[in-house]
Amino acid sequence: KNKIKLFVTLSFALLMAFGNVNSVSAAKSTTKSTPYGTLKGFISPYNSGSSKLCEGGTTIGQNVKSIKIKIEAKKTSTGTNIGSTQNQHANSSGVGDTLECWGYTGTKVTFYGTHDAIHTTGYHVYTSTQY
């Protein structure tokens, strides 16, 4: 009986550990210190219906006097620009910008700028700031 219990317990543990292999992976992030607080960059693949989409962004969680956040994305294989966003923030708290890529199921997308690379399967994100 103890062997059966152990087998069931181990089987359940393995299922929990590896059962989500095909699901969307968790967001990856990195941080960078700025004069106005810590900048966080992230990349997050996610599902919407049957399409695998991606989202990249930068946020800063403290009051800022002035900061410009820019995010750009290109399809890795061809270099095709698939979107960009850039916003200037002043006297704001918890500012941030995100960029979503729609309709690029199964492709590699590169988010790029000038700082802090984040790498995850098939995606790269770089956060970029000017202040």
PLM segments and residue spans:
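N-terminal prepro-regions of secreted/extracellular proteins
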Residues: K1-S48
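Generic detection of short hydrophobic beta-strand segments and adjacent strand-loop junctions
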Residues: K28-T34, N87-A90, G103, T127-Y131
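Short, surface-exposed binding/anchoring microloops in extracellular/periplasmic proteins
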Residues: S29-T76
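Short, exposed beta-strand-loop hairpins at the edges of beta-sheets
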Residues: I60-N63, W102-Y131
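A positively charged, amphipathic N-terminal helix/segment that binds anionic biomolecules
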Residues: K68-K70, T78, T114, T129
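Solvent-exposed serine/threonine-rich low-complexity stretches and specific carbohydrate-binding patches
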Residues: G79-G94
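Exposed aromatic-hydrophobic patches
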Residues: S93-Y104
